[in-house]
Amino acid sequence: MSEAGHKFLAKLGKKRLRPGGKRATDWLIAEGGFSKEKRILEVACNRGTTAIELAQRFGCKITAVDMDAQALEVAKKSAETAGVGHLIRFERANAMKLPYEDASFDIVINEAMLTMQADQAKKKCVMEYLRVLKPEGLLLTHDVLLKEAKESVRQELSQAIHVNVGPLTQDGWEQVM
């Protein structure tokens, strides 16, 4: 079986393992109103690149979760090396069943992970994000948007990155949200 595309790219040293790269992450950060006082949850943090950047820039406390134990170990080491290990708590958790109390976070950030989920799972994830957000909290996310629904595009993308994907059109994303 072939290795998932994002894991292969990580082995090559690529740090931004999502569509949109640093530019999309920078847009989310600019929209976030991050500060030291805010409690942040990053879902699907992978190797912790965004969490580390947020901790360095804003000094905020971050909980960063992922399902990949190996990626979390890399993330922990990277955060320590960057001098922000005390600000970030890395945990293994499922986005569809987050182990946090209701209204726990000011900001939930999630980058290009929902596309990797089936449609019903996308909705479950978003419902969990909203559950753990405080009233007036902010959900920051970006993902793959199709101009038109074409099964051939989905299949081609899945084959290219060796992961079953489900990108949506604007209408599809609006239904999920």
Set out the residue ranges of the language-model regions.
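A short glycine-rich, Lys/Arg-flanked "PGG" loop and its adjoining helix->strand segment in the class I
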Residues: 123-138
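Short, glycine-/aromatic-enriched active-site segment of Class I SAM-dependent methyltransferases
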Residues: 144-164
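Conserved alpha-helix/loop element of class I SAM-dependent methyltransferases that forms part
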Residues: 18-36
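Class I SAM-dependent methyltransferase Rossmann-like catalytic core
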Residues: 5-19
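Short alpha-helix
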Residues: 166-177
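A short SAM/SAH-binding and catalytic strip from SAM-dependent methyltransferases
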Residues: 107-121
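A short acidic, Gly/Pro-enriched loop at the edge of an enzyme's catalytic core
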Residues: 96-108
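Class I SAM-dependent methyltransferase SAM/SAH-binding core
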Residues: 39-41, 47-97
